[in-house]
């Protein structure tokens, strides 16, 4: 009876994996990473004042970056932001 439980658990976990795996590959993920352009702007943890650009879901907008931390939705120029995030 012990082997039957183990096989049942393996079968259950296999089915669970097959059902949830497509969700991991949804539109919010590209090449295994979260789509940068969907992240919110994030000033970071420091108090410097660098002008940067982020994609707000529609277009690229300026924000002040503190110089450390934050996320990858941060570009040095509007052109770089549009190149990465604007839909063709």
UniProtKB/Swiss-Prot annotation:
Reactive bond for trypsin (site feature) positions: 47-48
Any one Gene Ontology BP term: envenomation resulting in negative regulation of voltage-gated potassium channel activity in another organism
Pfam families listed in its UniProt record: Kunitz_BPTI (PF00014)
Tissues in which the UniProt entry reports expression: Expressed by the venom gland.
Primary location: secreted
MF-aspect GO terms: potassium channel regulator activity; serine-type endopeptidase inhibitor activity; toxin activity
Family, as annotated: Belongs to the venom Kunitz-type family. 01 (intermediate) subfamily.
Protein role: Serine protease inhibitor that inhibits trypsin at a molar ratio of 1:1.
Protein name per Swiss-Prot or TrEMBL: Kunitz-type U15-theraphotoxin-Hhn1m
Organism (species): Cyriopagopus hainanus
Organism taxonomic ancestry: Eukaryota, Metazoa, Ecdysozoa, Arthropoda, Chelicerata
